[in-house]
Amino acid sequence: MYKAPKMRFAPRRIAEIPFRGTIAAGVFNTLVSGRIAYPFRITEVKMIFTDDANNWIRHGWYVGRNRSQPTTGPPTGVNIFGRESPVADFVGKAIIRVVPCNIEYPEGGMIIHFYTQNSGPYAYERNASCTIEAM
């Protein structure tokens, strides 16, 4: 009788970091996560564009080591999707945009920045999340 070896699977540490808040008309704004002390990989980002986004809302995802929240443009740090595409921001209307990815940050101490530019005439309620997995 053959007995298969026991397989051991380490539990995966997965977290979904929410980003939510109102942004006034005609401004830039950045929301930041807490410091992520361990090595991680970003596995998915999700952005909800409502009907009133009307392609006026532009989102971008950045990582860096400081908690800067500039009000005149994108945050300092590296655009997460900048190495994958020359156009690394997301624009939409009436869509839930889910972007699966596998972007690793082997050093700890990073902070995720969710950047929004509202070019429209109205305030906008933004809603997004970033899913990370410990490495």
Q: Which residue ranges define each predicted feature?
A:
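Beta-strand-centric surfaces of beta-sandwich/beta-rich domains
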Residues: 1-135
